[in-house]
Amino acid sequence: MNLHTYIVALLFSILITTASAAEKIVMLRHAEKSAKGLGQLNCQGLNRALALPNILIKKFGNPSVIYTPNPSVRKKDQGQLYNYIRPLATIEPTAIRLGMPVNTAFGFDDIKSLKEALLNPIYSNSVIYVVWEHHLLETMTREILSSFGKDPKIVPQWDGNDFDSIYVITIADSKGGHKKVSFMKDSEGLDNAQTSCPN
């Protein structure tokens, strides 16, 4: 191998290593909900869910794992307790497209355990999709950033009428074994989804 070929191969190897040495946590709220609550989506939410696979895969690539709350853990909705299936229903079309299971190990309010799972070193080179309740996603995002010494105030408040935002945390390796952590707010671009259910 001549010197030129060796240098090119070395640079390529470094680029591949650098590109893969990052975890990306992609967080989205469940899609639009029924006016009666019910723990369920409405027709617009269903249409958003059906459109999500193309959006998420194009923006972020295939995930290593998908997390949603355990639907058997009940949540109050309009004063009534229901099985909380909105997040799972939102991401199911994406999981089906990818041929992937959905991890529902944690109840909707158990963000402590969810956060610990997301920060497990096994995901250090992974893309993770998390679909959850928006207030809890906002809280967890701030907690993760704080744990790495970042200002939690950079995380905007998640508006109650906002079903389109995507919060993204990237945790990358850097010199000296430290982690470089960044946050960005993205969007699905699906607010104009049809309000009537597909035939």
Listing of model-derived features with the role each one plays in the protein:
Residues 128:
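Conserved beta-strand position immediately N-terminal to the Walker
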Residues 131-133:
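Short beta-strand segments
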Residues 22-125, 136-199:
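Active-site-proximal alpha-helix that buttresses catalytic centers in soluble enzyme cores
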Residues 17-21:
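Sec/Tat signal peptide C-region and signal peptidase I cleavage site
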Residues 1-3:
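N-terminal secretory signal peptides that target proteins for export/translocation
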Residues 6-15:
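Bacterial N-terminal signal peptides
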